[in-house]
Amino acid sequence: MSEIQSLTAQALADVAAAHTPDQLETLRVALLGKNGSITAQLKQLGTLPADQRKAAGEAINLARDALTTALSERKQVLETAALDARLEGERIDVTLPGRRGERGGLHPVTRTLERIVEIFARLGYELSDGPEIEDDWHNFEALNFPPHHPARAMHDTFYFGDGRLLRTHTSGVQVRYMDTAVATKSGPPLRMIAAGKVYRSDSDQTHSPMFHQVEGLLVDEHSNFADLKGTLSEFVRAFFERDFEMRFRPSYFPFVEPGAEVDIAWQQPDGSTRWLEVLGCGMVHPNVLRSVGIDPERYTGFAFGLGVERFAMLRYGVNDLRAFFENDVRFLRQFA
């Protein structure tokens, strides 16, 4: 009996002194395993006198239960300590300065395009879209371009082998818009703008083979040139957020009659003022209205077009159009 008590006391001390789960498992096997010391005591019960077996068995069972409980409790203590140590090692110091994310920004051409569209939306114009690969009818014929017009020449237009082309202006969207309005009997009256990429075989400091254009169209029973002037004057004032002296110069565009180019009195860095062309416009040619099934005797309309990059250059003081397409981060970061 004293032997089991001594063995139990020593075993409990060893369990309490274990510092790792591996040490604890080694003790468990040595004490309670198949060949463990407590197990050996149970096997020796049969060799004891009959009057001692009951008391010895009770003592061994009590020792086994005490050791099992001690092993379980010590295991829990070691696991908790290990978890605390891991949490401490992985703790995030919230007082450290964070990593700042780089703030992006819209491209200046995109900013300008969205600004133009938003202004015309306030004036009641609906944004419409169309294909960049266009057919001859929508890009030229329906817009009153005679077959001999210079804009049809190969040096102005990018053609595909099947006769299709990269649109040279967004006016083709106006034709599609009017076609749909007539077919669905949703207009006229109608007003819309088309915005997107256009393509022309031209490249220098102020021209790019690909650029962005916004064109607008209004068709109604009583629209006139005064309405056109008022619309464009309001747009220019809203875009630049200041008033400009404007002039409308007679000009020729096949799809309008009369046609005009719009100049604004632009102040130079040296304080002088010069006229700067910013828009083309005019009253929709009757042939264009007829091509989409609108009666020009009843309806009139006006149209206008502008280059987005041109307005971006003026708004941001950029002198070279090509800077918008070179993807120089040093340049683009100024607009972020």
UniProtKB/Swiss-Prot annotation:
Q: Which cofactors does this protein require?
A: Mg(2+)
Q: Name one Pfam family in it.
A: Phe_tRNA-synt_N
GO BP annotations, alphabetical order: phenylalanyl-tRNA aminoacylation
Task: Quote the cofactor binding remark.
Answer: Binds 2 magnesium ions per tetramer.
The GO terms describing molecular function are: ATP binding; magnesium ion binding; phenylalanine-tRNA ligase activity; tRNA binding
Q: What is its EC number?
A: 6.1.1.20
| Reaction(s) the record says it catalyses | tRNA(Phe) + L-phenylalanine + ATP = L-phenylalanyl-tRNA(Phe) + AMP + diphosphate + H(+)
The cellular location(s) given in this protein's UniProt record come to: Cytoplasm
- Lyase: present as a keyword of the record? no
Q: Which GO terms describe its cellular component?
A: cytoplasm
Q: What InterPro entries is this protein classified in?
A: aa-tRNA-synth_II (IPR006195), aa-tRNA-synth_II/BPL/LPL (IPR045864), Phe-tRNA-synth_IIc_asu (IPR004529), Phe-tRNA_ligase_II_N (IPR004188), Phe_tRNA_ligase_alpha1_bac (IPR022911), Phenylalanyl-tRNA_Synthase (IPR002319), tRNA-bd_arm (IPR010978)
- List ligand-binding residues for Mg(2+): E257
For whether the record's keyword set contains Protein biosynthesis, the answer is yes
Q: Which UniProt keywords apply?
A: Aminoacyl-tRNA synthetase, ATP-binding, Cytoplasm, Ligase, Magnesium, Metal-binding, Nucleotide-binding, Protein biosynthesis
Uppermost EC category: ligase
The record, for CDD domains, names: PheRS_alpha_core (cd00496)
How is this protein organized at the quaternary level?
Answer: Tetramer of two alpha and two beta subunits.
In which family does this protein belong, per the annotation?
Answer: Belongs to the class-II aminoacyl-tRNA synthetase family. Phe-tRNA synthetase alpha subunit type 1 subfamily.
The record's annotation in PANTHER family points to: PHENYLALANINE--TRNA LIGASE, MITOCHONDRIAL, PHENYLALANYL-TRNA SYNTHETASE
Put simply, this protein is called Phenylalanine--tRNA ligase alpha subunit
Q: Which organism is it from?
A: Xanthomonas campestris pv. campestris (strain ATCC 33913 / DSM 3586 / NCPPB 528 / LMG 568 / P 25)
Q: Which classification does the entry list for the species?
A: Bacteria, Pseudomonadati, Pseudomonadota, Gammaproteobacteria, Lysobacterales
